[in-house]
Amino acid sequence: MRPAILGVTTQSVPATYCMSRGNAASVARFSSGPMPNPIVWNVDPVLVRLGPLTVRYYGICFGLALATGFAVWFTRVRRFGESAAFAEQFLYFGVPAVIIGGRLGYCFFYAPQIYLANPLRVFALWQGGIASHGVAAGLAITLWAFSRRHHITWTRLSDYFAPAVALSVGWIRVGNFFNSEVIGRPASVPWAVVFARHDLVPRHPAQLYDLLIGPFTYLVLLAVERRNIRPIGSGLIAGTFLTVYFGLRIFVEQYKDFYVEQLREMPPFRSIEQWLGFPIHTGQWLSVLPVLAGMFLIGRAMRSGVRLSEIARTNH
């Protein structure tokens, strides 16, 4: 066994240990002999303890996500001719939208029975539980309200904002990794990770798969924007973000291990799943609507928009 660095080691994990902590059916396909040196992740999610106060890696990552998102938003808004005051004002609406939307999304979609039994737990943010789909819904509503307040189209604001979300969301997945949450299914891949604070089963590092989606989507948005296919405000950038990001989320969700699946247990969703013959998890169901909305925005932009290069030629 190699020495631990920040709680990280690589060592053989006997299948019998996995059986003792994990689901036997989940690991039955593994050999009864030693596992091939998975990474063992056993990092304390608390970085610093100051008496009753704690500084957690997740909190730092959340702050970095907000800072990254605002920096990209501010740069884009200024580049397209809006004032600094306009960019800063959105901060006072956007941050609450992220927190409130993400928290309510988690409570409603993933653990409604817990929070209906004790509604005050909704405010217990330190216990964790923020859903990215709730964040997306909160930001969409906030962008609409902000656009009405400032007499600017919702699609224009969304085209400004989409790359900011794509580049910042990865920080949240880093925080999930430090918390040993949103873990993947049992796996025998060479890069499998044992989240020792959860169990001793080698698993897909699903948080890192999600982490890669954001920067990839950001690069796609830059490529689309640089091709001058349609002007900012057509909704093409926002539509591309919704389609690519949440489309990839549908793919990655299949590698996650799920412990709360209230949405898929509802009769309409359960019936569709039985008809299809394979499981569709809550995160996949929640990603379908953003993908459809993105495809609608792309189609609308391509039908009604004009090329940015054509506008430039007209201005000359």
Provide a role label for each language-model segment:
Residues 29-316:
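Hydrophobic, membrane-interfacing alpha helices
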Residues 3-4, 22, 38, 301:
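Absolute N-terminal positional cue centered near the fourth residue
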Residues 2-3, 12, 16-29:
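Low-acidity, Ser/Thr- and Arg-rich intrinsically disordered low-complexity segments
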